């Protein structure tokens, strides 16, 4: 130990100190953001002299590394750290995350909420999913190519200041969707053994879901990919059982085809929900490919992710729409829906007068599928928090992951009892930012950078070299006005959205993206001209 005035330093032999797993020595010192210098002893041996703050932070990294948890945060992943060359890992990540009850329930909105028949619902599901998922696959390529997390990459794409705003929105979105997903699964678990007096309380259901999420997200990238590679299997099996029981019930009918302005409005509103779900992973995308080597074929990454996203989204949502059509044709199933939404329909299909005990077991498995959907939320929330503000990057990723899970648990329990409807409406509103983000990011890459060589990785945290974000922030604000005018929700219908059909139609995504695109491409050339970045 070395004392100098009121400062306390610890001296460590350079040759005896090895980098922490998932974090280089250089990055570890940079994160500490404290006084660090080298010293030379009388025998010419060099030492690193660090303040006690840096030493304490180093201890945290070493502790988490000893548990085999990923300690690397938002700093760029170097080429020698890129050891994940599995295309299957990239594809299965999103395959499992979407083979879940949340996407199944979303597909049911077509018939249940928007009054579309089965055929119309299927067409909307396919078209709007494709529109959304291609951006997730596209930005996943950036992770392997540049080694940057999505919110750090955003500093280049939307501007440094604007990226911080999107990071904040992303933190809210990660926790918010975790709350909504957890509440749905907790309600389904609560239905198991209904009437026996031995049911799973709502709070316990939330604790089970969050506990499972913590076990995986704590360890980081490698364990997440290992879990997601296989977690789709039991979920897929249960969905096959639902198909079998739905077919045996004979309650499914396709419904009549109806046209007109009101139907058009319903198509747009349902499509808006579908697009938001499929594109929802866009602001997470690069986080799950950063450890893939730069030499990995970009087309393989893109098309494998398109397939890994498309199949589970099409499959679960179409099945959800079919289940909803059946529920509309049966008063008992409809009563289950009115009481417990699509969780109630799942229970009605699998348990009473059906598979009984085995059906309840299937309900438990499907409720646990939410863990696979929550994992990306709780991993990315940590990286988004670190990207928000430099001092927050000092806090290890593992700590942020635990904090995100704790916040999700703390809010999901009262939300399930008292304001789950409010949470769903709130998250629907948050989702509109995706279209604005996509419009700005694609403009920057295709019009102004045009190739990966235009991204200087060394500038990832350099305020002097990164785009300021004047154009990006202006586009975000104007795009938000477009969203407000075009959205059609139960709590708000915009002046333009209300003009479509009897009940209005949601074109918030379309207006938000188009207005942001126009403003950004007017202001970005001026920003480059006067600021040079």
UniProtKB/Swiss-Prot annotation:
Extracellular membrane side: 120-121, 219-256, 321-347, 419-465
Question: InterPro entries given for it?
Answer: NCS1, Pur-cyt_permease, Pur-cyt_permease_Fcy2/21/22
Q: Which residues lie on this side of the membrane: Cytoplasmic?
A: 1-98, 142-198, 277-300, 368-398, 486-533
Cross-link position per record: Glycyl lysine isopeptide (Lys-Gly) (interchain with G-Cter in ubiquitin): 16
Q: Main subcellular localization, coarse class?
A: membrane
Tell me the CDD domains matching this sequence: SLC-NCS1sbd_CobB-like
Q: Which residues cross the membrane?
A: 99-119, 122-141, 199-218, 257-276, 301-320, 348-367, 399-418, 466-485
Q: What processes does the entry annotate via GO biological process terms? A: cytidine transport; cytosine transport; purine-containing compound transmembrane transport
Map out region (Surface seeking) in residue numbers.
165-184
Q: Which GO terms describe its cellular component?
A: cell periphery; fungal-type vacuole membrane; plasma membrane
| Record PTM | Not N-glycosylated.
The chain residues annotated with the modification Phosphoserine are 18
Q: What else is known?
A: Present with 23600 molecules/cell in log phase SD medium.
- State what this protein does: This permease has a broad specificity towards purines, and also transport cytosine and 5-methylcytosine but neither uracil nor thymine.
This one is known as Purine-cytosine permease FCY2
| Native source species | Saccharomyces cerevisiae (strain ATCC 204508 / S288c) (Baker's yeast)
Which gene produces this protein?
FCY2
């Amino acid at each position: 130990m070395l004392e100098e005035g009121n400062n306390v330093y610890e001296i460590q032999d350079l040759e005896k100190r090895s980098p922490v797993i998932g974090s280089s020595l250089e990055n570890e010192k940079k994160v500490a953001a404290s006084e660090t210098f080298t010293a030379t002893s009388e025998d010419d041996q060099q030492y690193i002299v660090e303040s006690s703050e840096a030493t304490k932070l180093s201890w945290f990294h070493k502790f988490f590394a000893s548990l085999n948890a990923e300690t690397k945060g938002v700093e760029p992943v170097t080429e020698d750290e890129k050891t994940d060359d599995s295309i299957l890992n990239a594809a299965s990540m999103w395959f499992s995350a979407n083979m879940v009850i949340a996407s199944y329930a979303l597909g049911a909105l077509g018939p249940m909420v928007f009054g579309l028949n089965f055929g119309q619902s299927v067409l909307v599901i396919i078209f709007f999913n494709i529109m959304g998922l291609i951006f997730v696959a596209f930005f996943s390529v950036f992770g392997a190519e540049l080694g940057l997390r999505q919110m750090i990459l955003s500093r280049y794409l939307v501007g440094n200041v604007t990226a911080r705003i999107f990071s904040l929105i992303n933190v809210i979105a990660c926790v918010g969707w975790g709350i909504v997903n957890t509440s749905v699964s907790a309600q389904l678990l609560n239905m198991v053994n209904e009437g026996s007096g031995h049911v799973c309380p709502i709070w316990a259901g939330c604790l089970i879901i969050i506990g499972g999420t913590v076990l995986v997200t704590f360890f980081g990238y490698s364990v997440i990919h290992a879990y997601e590679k296989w977690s789709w299997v039991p979920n897929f099996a249960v969905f096959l059982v639902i198909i079998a029981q739905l077919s045996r019930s004979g309650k499914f009918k396709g419904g009549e085809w109806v046209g007109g302005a009101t139907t058009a409005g319903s198509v747009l509103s349902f499509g808006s929900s579908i697009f938001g779900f499929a594109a929802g992973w866009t602001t997470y995308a690069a986080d799950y490919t950063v450890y893939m080597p730069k030499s990995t074929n970009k087309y393989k990454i893109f098309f494998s992710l398109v397939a890994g996203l498309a199949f589970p989204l099409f499959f679960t949502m179409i099945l959800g729409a079919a289940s909803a059509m059946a529920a509309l044709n049966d008063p008992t199933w409809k009563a289950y829906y009115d009481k417990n939404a699509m969780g109630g329909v799942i229970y009605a299909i699998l348990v009473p007068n059906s598979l009984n005990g085995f059906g309840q077991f299937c309900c438990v498995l499907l409720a646990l599928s939410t863990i696979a959907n929550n994992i990306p939320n709780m991993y990315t929330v940590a990286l988004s928090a670190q990207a928000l503000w430099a001092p927050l990057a000092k806090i290890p990723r593992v700590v942020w992951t635990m904090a995100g899970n704790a916040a999700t648990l703390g809010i999901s329990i009262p939300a399930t009892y008292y304001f789950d409807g409010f949470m769903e409406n709130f998250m629907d509103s948050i989702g509109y930012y995706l279209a604005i983000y996509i419009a700005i990011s694609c403009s920057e890459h295709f019009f102004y950078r045009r190739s990966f060589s235009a991204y200087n990785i060394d500038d990832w945290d350099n305020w002097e070299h990164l785009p300021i974000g004047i154009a990006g922030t202006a586009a975000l604000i104007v795009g938000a006005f477009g969203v407000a005018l075009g959205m059609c929700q139960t709590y708000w219908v915009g002046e333009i959205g209300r003009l479509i059909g009897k009940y209005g139609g949601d074109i918030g995504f379309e207006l938000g993206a188009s207005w942001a695109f126009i403003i950004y491409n007017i202001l970005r050339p001026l920003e480059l001209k006067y600021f040079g970045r």
